[in-house]
Amino acid sequence: MKNRYIASFEAAQIAEKQIPQFRSGDTVRIGVEIKEGEKKRIQTFEGIIIGRSGNGVDATFTIRKLGANSIGVERIFPLYSESLKSFEVIRRGRVRRAKLNFLRGLKGKAARIKELKR
């Protein structure tokens, strides 16, 4: 059980940040603040959510994208990080798994995910 002061601090952190609903299989575009020396810039990273883990302030999610020459790039982000500046869900994916680790072995058209129809 957490200390009540820590719990209230974490609740304030969560309430402060507005993050849209997303699941595994969704394609998202996030803006991450990068510090290079004294300069700051926002770098966008677009890919498929292959998993979420944790809960509360400690929650993280993993994004995978295919870069140049079909090389996969994965990044793990804390959900309530100060460096996340924007979060946009581009399309909803229709998947039946919580963790999409099988995508790591697939390339090209085999790595596509069907779009969820509403």
UniProtKB/Swiss-Prot annotation:
SUPFAM superfamilies: Translation proteins SH3-like domain (SSF50104). Keywords: Ribonucleoprotein, Ribosomal protein. InterPro entries: Ribosomal_bL19, Ribosomal_bL19_sf, Translation_prot_SH3-like_sf. One of its GO terms (molecular function) is structural constituent of ribosome. One of its GO terms (cellular component) is cytosolic large ribosomal subunit. GO terms for biological process: translation. It comes from the Bacteria. Coiled coil: none annotated. This protein is located at the 30S-50S ribosomal subunit interface and may play a role in the structure and function of the aminoacyl-tRNA binding site. NCBIfam families: rplS_bact. PANTHER family: LARGE RIBOSOMAL SUBUNIT PROTEIN BL19M, RIBOSOMAL PROTEIN L19. Belongs to the bacterial ribosomal protein bL19 family. This is Large ribosomal subunit protein bL19.
